[in-house]
Regions:
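Amphipathic alpha-helical polymerization modules
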Residues: 1-124
Length: 124
């Protein structure tokens, strides 16, 4: 039973990664946020709850500078005509997406194998 819970927890954690990556991709060109300035890339991290030992997913904001593109006609251009774009690199996000997908698939395989073993044990 524990193996089912562990793999389900792993899939749930990877879901958080997928949500963060999706948000980054969706906001890759967002130059204005309610907080002001361009969107900042979010990074999902995994930690462990000391009391329960369970994995926890959280997000942090990537503080690296984004791209500056000269576009004096853009509504968000500064006095010199530059627009600050998010610090999101689509290629990085796509690689992270593939990794998260593979980890999710691995957890799903473990879940299916554990379920199959439990069924066989109940037949005995």
């Amino acid at each position: 039973m524990r193996s089912l819970a562990i793999s389900a927890e792993g899939m749930s954690t990877q879901q958080k990664f997928l949500e963060v990556i999706s948000s980054n991709i969706a906001n890759a060109e967002t130059t204005r946020t309610p907080e002001g300035g361009p969107y900042r890339r979010q990074i999902a991290t995994i930690g462990a709850d000391a009391a329960s030992g369970r994995a926890t997913a959280s997000t942090i904001t990537d503080t690296r500078a984004g791209r500056l593109i000269y576009d004096p006609g853009h509504p968000d251009a500064d006095k010199d005509g530059f627009v600050a774009y998010p610090n999101v690199d689509i290629n990085t996000e796509l690689v992270d997406l593939m990794i998260a997908r593979r980890v999710h698939e691995a957890n799903a395989s473990v879940f299916q194998a554990a379920k199959s073993m439990l069924r066989r044990a109940l037949e005995i």
